[in-house]
Design a protein with these regions (language model features):
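Short, solvent-exposed amphipathic alpha-helical segments in soluble enzyme
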Residues: 19-25, 77-79, 128-129
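Short, ordered loop/turn segments at secondary-structure junctions
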Residues: 10, 35-37, 65-66, 87-90, ...
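C-terminal binding/interaction regions
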Residues: 2, 7-14, 18, 95-166
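Glycine-rich phosphate-binding loop
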Residues: 47-86, 90
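Short glycine/serine/threonine-rich phosphate/pyrophosphate-binding segments
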Residues: 12-16, 41-44, 64-73, 92-95, ...
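Short glycine-rich or small-residue beta-strand-to-loop segments that form or flank ligand, phosphate
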Residues: 2-7, 31-33, 60-62, 83, ...
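Glycine-rich phosphate/diphosphate-binding loop of Rossmann-like nucleotide-binding domains
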Residues: 1-39
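N-terminal beta-loop-helix "entrance" segment that forms/cooperates
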Residues: 32-52
Length: 166
């Protein structure tokens, strides 16, 4: 059970790093690739067909900016879940990539997460939640992660209250 992480350009690696680090921290196997929907469309189609026919990947995370068609192209060749990270670029920030991701025609869904670096982490957590549906140990790791997040916020609030009470 694994995740394919595909970026449209190697320059997206810094943003995708959050996804890779999160997958590693949960012990989820992944493969990372650079494949462009526009510059290497044949390779994009071939990779998506590999994802569809093989059992290696259950979820695909992709990151692309501008005319972010990578997720849609991959989704057109596989029924596996596609999670897309909108990559900010000039002059529109992440608005253009977000719209390209969410404006898919009926029948070819692509999920979108937060734009930018937070999107990398959220994409991985979303992929992990999908994998956890059939992996009880991974589901427990995800519950532990959420508990730790809650505890950190409660501790931060207690610290703030203590500081403000002075």
């Amino acid at each position: 059970m694994g995740v394919a992480v595909v970026m449209g350009s190697k320059s997206d690696l810094e943003l995708v790093r959050g996804a890779l680090d999160t997958l590693e921290s949960f012990g989820v196997e992944y493969t990372a690739r650079v494949i462009s929907a526009h510059r290497t469309p044949a390779e994009a189609a071939a990779f998506a067909k590999e994802v569809e026919s093989g059992g290696k990947y259950q979820v695909v995370i992709c990151a692309a900016g501008m005319a972010a068609h990578l997720g849609g192209v991959l989704a057109s060749y596989t029924t596996k879940p596609i999670v897309a990270i909108p990559v900010p670029s000039q002059p529109f920030g992440a608005a253009d990539s977000l719209l390209a991701i969410v404006q898919m025609p009926p029948g070819v869904p692509v999920a979108a997460v937060t734009a930018g670096k937070a999107g990398g982490k959220n994409a991985a957590l979303y992929a992990i939640s999908i994998l956890a549906l059939s992996d009880p140990a991974l589901a427990e790791k995800l519950r532990d992660f959420r508990r730790r997040q809650r505890e950190q916020i409660i501790a931060a609030d207690a610290e703030l209250q203590k500081e403000l009470a002075k």
